[in-house]
């Protein structure tokens, strides 16, 4: 299945980060504005945020019959029962220092996904992946939405999937082109299997990834037949250049 994706991915990403050319006819006027000479990177992600994606994320939450966590009391109850588990920093994973320790939690299968991705990423690039956000309460989401009009709502059919604890935001800002491509390939493969629903958010430059509980079952098959989703596509794309 991985080889079937190689051709599409190699072509789709060829111009993803093309740069705007500087118009030579405007050099004189630009000399009065020192910052204007900086070339801007075109935003062309593989996983664009969309209304349909939010619907799919909420459909998964409804399928699992998970609650949207209302407040800190409900959050602490889910921690106590083990329905939410802690995300812990390690050699392969770091956590954004501003993330409230009380919200460094997620569903067990989501943590498995984060740990698996962080390990293969570390094996490839010898660097850590960073978690910027995990579980949120409705109260927190409403506060976030007041500050950021692009944030998902706290209620309704397109509510943020962070409210169910099945979603994490992973740092995208500061990654190299190859690092971004590696993560995109990894997510593309898992999305094709119906295991994740990813988005690349421009405002916060992060990978927003909702993880299905089906990831647990798929993960067990990888224990028997080890395979990292990004390996073959990433190698094939690099050798074709």
Regions found by a protein language model. Name each.
Residues 19-25, 152-241:
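Catalytic cores and adjacent binding grooves of peptidoglycan-active enzymes
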Residues 106-113, 117, 140, 179-186:
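Stable alpha-helical elements in mature extracytoplasmic
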Residues 127-144:
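Acidic helix-start/capping segments at beta-turn-to-alpha-helix junctions
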């Amino acid at each position: 299945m991985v080889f079937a994706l190689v051709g599409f991915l190699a072509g789709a990403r060829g111009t993803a980060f093309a740069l705007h050319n500087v118009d030579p006819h405007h050099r004189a006027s630009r000399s009065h504005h020192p910052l204007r000479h900086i070339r801007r990177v075109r935003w062309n992600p593989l996983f664009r945020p969309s209304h349909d994606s939010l619907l799919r994320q909420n459909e998964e939450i409804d399928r699992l019959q998970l609650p949207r966590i209302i407040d800190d009391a409900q959050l602490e109850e889910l921690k106590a029962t083990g329905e939410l588990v802690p995300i812990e920093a390690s050699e392969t994973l770091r956590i954004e220092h501003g993330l409230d320790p009380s919200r460094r939690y997620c569903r067990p299968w989501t943590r498995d996904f984060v740990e698996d991705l962080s390990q293969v990423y570390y094996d490839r690039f010898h660097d850590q992946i960073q978690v910027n956000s995990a579980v949120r309460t409705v109260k927190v989401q409403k506060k976030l939405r007041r500050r950021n009009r692009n944030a998902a709502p706290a209620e309704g059919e397109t509510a943020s999937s962070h409210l169910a604890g099945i979603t994490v935001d992973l740092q995208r800002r500061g990654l190299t082109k190859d690092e971004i491509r590696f993560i995109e390939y990894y997510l593309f493969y898992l999305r094709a299997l119906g295991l994740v629903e990813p988005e690349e958010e421009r405002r916060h430059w992060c990978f927003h990834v909702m993880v299905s509980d089906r990831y647990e079952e798929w993960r067990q098959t990888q224990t028997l037949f080890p395979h990292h989703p990004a390996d073959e596509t990433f190698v094939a794309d690099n050798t074709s250049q």
